[in-house]
Amino acid sequence: MPPAAPSVARSREGGGIGQRRLVFPKSARRTLPCPIALCLGLCLAAAAATTTRASAAAFASAGDTTAMSAFNLLHLVTKSQPVAPRACGLPSGSCRDKKNCKVVFSQQELRKRLTPLQYHVTQEKGTESAFEGEYTHHKDPGIYKCVVCGTPLFKSETKFDSGSGWPAFHDVISSEAIEFTDDFSYGMHRVETSCSQCGAHLGHIFDDGPRPTGKRYCINSASLSFTPADSSEAEGSGIKESGSPAAADRAEL
């Protein structure tokens, strides 16, 4: 007849309710060798501890799941909130509304006389590929103008190599030549630059330029035309444009 297996009993000694101890039948204590009895006792103790830990883990897991679900819900709600743009501070009747621009062209006309890239950049706020623009490494003296309406924007003396891949200038010919608008596209905040006369998109402005202004006007080559210094007049008007027919067909309202 096989020896009886030990059992687990609760001890009430010293008020220790809930504590467990191993109780071996007398027959087992008489017949089982000491090593075997010890092994059985250790196995039963390990099983009891595992059961207790499993129960605690189940409760903890349920709590963690609830907490994680609440966190995920909060995360999704937060992510779904749109970025609240700040007021761009444009004056009433700004040229960003094409009807209020001083110089207005029909889209049909612009598609005819601008290249696809020039149209995309100036009218659709596109961006040309870095280091591929016509004026990225251009160093000739002269004046850079809006490719759409011919408004003088930058002098070659203010152009510098920013290493960004686009033409960069640290100052403008006139503070009234360019308008600034808050741009929250692509999940970031930038300041867009556009021509104040026709509303053409030029690029963006940053605060990491050289002295004396500390500004960097990062401008698309496709937004610009260039007039050599030897062909320009005193005020930059009546100049023969290089690479741009924009000024010839300009219609002022």
From Swiss-Prot:
Name the residues annotated as catalytic in the UniProt entry: 218 (nucleophile)
Q: In which tissues is it expressed?
A: Widely expressed. Detected in the sensory epithelia of the organ of Corti and vestibular end organs as early as P2 up to adulthood (at protein level). In the organ of Corti, present in inner and outer hair cells and, to a lesser extent, in supporting cells (at protein level). In hair cells, distributed throughout the cell body. Barely detectable level in stereocilia. Also observed in spiral ganglion neurons, but not in the stria vascularis.
- Which stretch carries the motif Endoplasmic reticulum retention signal? 250-253
- One Pfam family this sequence matches: SelR
Q: Share what the entry says about its subunit structure, partners included.
A: Monomer.
Record-linked NCBIfam families = peptide-methionine (R)-S-oxide reductase MsrB
Q: What does this protein do?
A: Catalyzes the reduction of free and protein-bound methionine sulfoxide to methionine.
Q: Supply the name of the protein.
A: Methionine-R-sulfoxide reductase B3, mitochondrial
Q: Which organism is it from?
A: Mus musculus (Mouse)
Q: Coding gene?
A: Msrb3
